[in-house]
UniProtKB/Swiss-Prot annotation:
Domain notes per entry: The leucine-zipper domain and the CCHC NOA-type zinc-fingers constitute the UBAN region and are essential for polyubiquitin binding and for the activation of IRF3.
GO molecular function, one term: K63-linked polyubiquitin modification-dependent protein binding
Intracellular or extracellular location(s): Cytoplasm; Nucleus
Name of the molecule in the record: NF-kappa-B essential modulator
The species this protein was found in: Bos taurus (Bovine)
Amino acid sequence: MSRPPWKSPLCEMVQPSGSPAGDQDMLGEESSLGKPAMLHVPSEQGTPETFQRCLEENQELRDAIRQSNQMLRERCEELQHFQGNQREEKAFLMQKFQEARDLVVRLSLEKRELRQQREQALKEVERLKTCQQQMAEDKASVKAQVTSLLGELQESQSRLEAATKERQALESRARVASEKARQLESEREALEQRHSVQVDQLVLQNESMEAALRMERQAASEEKRKLAQLQVAYHQLFQEYDNHMKSSMVSSERNRGLQLEDLKQQLQQAEEALVAKQEVIDKLKEEAEQHKIVMETVPVLKAQADIYKADFQAERQAREKLAEKKEFLQEQLEQLQREYSRLKTSCQESARIEDMRKRHVEVSQPPLAPGPAHHSFHLNPSSQRRSPPDEPPKFCCPKCQYQAPDIDTLQIHVMECIE
């Protein structure tokens, strides 16, 4: 069984005894502590006074031993109390206290050896004193270690508090950062939604513009086709007119040929303008494809869409101008057709009159004198009708009746006047 913790070998080193043998032992111990002359008297020579004195000395020694035992008990209890407190406070100090306990055990063994070897008691006591001093030094060192450990503990506690405060600050900063990240995420999602809506709107606007461009191209192709049909009709009309003019009148053919050449030049210019507009349309289509490629850059795409819209409006205005010019040319063509019809009618009338004159000449051939007069009478309307083509053509604005010197000036003036 394990002995109680408060009972150590140090407490059992010296126990007072009331027996004479115990007194003699204690007397022997006291004689070894400093009174050897009084204890080495033979027992057979002792007197009652000597015995009484020995008893008194024995009592004094017992008191001294009791006091020393009490002091040792107190020190042992103090050491045990200190050891228990240190064991409760710091577990790793058990090694030092274990060394002290081993030292106490060794001292108890030495005390037993002192009981067996009384002649070495003083040396053992001195060694005990030395051991006590060593224990005091160890105690001081242990106290210093405990003080340093307490300082380290306080420092670690202060560091722990600082780390706790820093952790709390970091947690608050992390919460703020997480809130800010959530806000930024929501803003980013809203911005992405707005950008996606803007991109969809721009895509729809681009598709509508492409559809309008396709419609404009279809309208341009339709107008070109109509213009080609008009040109074919014009060429046919011109051929008929040319044939008729060759058969009817040579001088009018030359003047009308010049006018038709001018009309051909106008038609050629209109065709060139159509080709140029077709090139512009192709260029706009390429720009639209480039706009599709650059769709990711929304601000640049928006600016390009504005430019594209302006170009589209300019193209529409140019097409409107071209349509007006085409209408003007068509009106001129209709006017030429009407003039051709009028000339054809006049030629037919003149031919009919000539036939009537010939028949009249054949019927009334004897009176020859009136013939030239009648011939001149019938030729005057023809000559009067032929005289206007001999005159230079008049380039007149149909809107403000401006007289232009040539066809180019008239075209420029008509475009400005229409605008």
